[in-house]
Amino acid sequence: NVFESARKCVADNKKVGISIMAEKEIYAVSLTFDDEDIYYIPVYGFVLADYLIEKMTELINTSKNRSIVIDNLKDYLPIFDKTGVDEHSFMDIAVAAYLIHPNNDRYDYEALSKEYMSMLVMSRQELLGKQSIKEAYDKDDDSLLKLACLTSYVNYKCSDIITDILKKEEMYELYETIEMPLIFVLYDMQKFGIRVDKEALSDYSKVLVEKINVLEKEIYEEA
């Protein structure tokens, strides 16, 4: 069982790269937990969307040490509204890459594979053209499979490299204590339609900057 094997990896604090092919609905997932262990599981036959969500939730909630490596996590949080997932389960590789190079234009699997793996891969445009995820899924060729597997593989392969850079640059604590929780805060604001008070937001930004400065000072003093 693919999900059971992935859960064992996560329980041992090993990274599992995942990708979710979804728009309004989930159509497929891909899991990578070794160079040779790359799996694609589409919604098909007895494998229903609810089944995939249930198994993904079980896998995610097995992780307590950011072992689930995903890109653009906020886009996929609606999938888990009913089941619930723990923030500490995830490493958002795109957010981590942004911290390292905030001026880059893109943080997708193609950009990350080139920068951190020195590997050129087919882009989403090359694989899907102008098709949506749903259109590619309905067409039932291997383009969506390739996109899903490339994404989960790059997430998996880049995770340790990017984590090491964050730690070397003394940004990992910032990433873990501020950037990752902020993903869930922003999603909740979006979900519940919280009206943003500009003055309050400005005040919060000042507090956040102060906290970051204190954190940077503590890290510097400990170094």
Residue map of PLM features:
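Mixed-charge, glycine-rich, non-catalytic linkers/tails in nucleic-acid processing enzymes
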Residues: D81, L112, M122-A223
